[in-house]
Curated annotation (Swiss-Prot):
A GO cellular component entry from the record: nucleus
Transport recorded as keyword: no
Ranges of the DNA-binding region feature: 1-69
Listed name of the protein: SRY-related protein MG42
Stored PANTHER family: SOX TRANSCRIPTION FACTOR (PTHR10270), TRANSCRIPTION FACTOR SOX-12 (PTHR10270:SF221)
Organism phylogeny: Eukaryota, Metazoa, Chordata, Craniata, Vertebrata
InterPro entries, per database record: HMG_box_dom, HMG_box_dom_sf, SRY-related_HMG-box_TF-like
Naturally occurring in which organism (per UniProt): Tarentola mauritanica (Common wall gecko)
Length: 72
C-alpha cells in the first residue's frame, strides 16, 4: 500500500507533466530538482489548495487502511 501524497506531491503531479511534455527524455531525478525550487518559492497562501487536498487524501487513506503502518 502506498502512502498518501503530501502537498508537494499533489502540486508536483501537474507540474511534472508539464516538464515531461517539454523534455520527455529528462530523468525523474532532474525533474524533481527542477520542481523543488518553484515549490519553495510559492507563498503559503498559494500552497493552501495543495495542503487541503493532501489532508483529504490522508483522511481517506486512514479510512481505507485503518491498520496501515509505514514500513520503508
Amino acid at each position: 500500500v502506498k502512502r498518501p501524497m503530501n502537498a508537494f506531491m499533489v502540486w508536483s503531479q501537474n507540474e511534472r507533466r508539464k516538464i515531461m511534455d517539454q523534455w520527455p527524455d529528462m530523468h525523474n531525478a532532474e525533474i524533481s530538482k527542477r520542481l523543488g525550487r518553484p515549490w519553495q518559492l510559492l507563498q503559503d497562501s498559494e500552497k493552501i489548495p495543495f495542503v487541503k487536498e493532501a489532508g483529504r487524501l490522508r483522511v481517506k487513506h486512514m479510512a481505507d487502511y485503518p491498520n496501515y503502518k509505514y514500513r520503508p
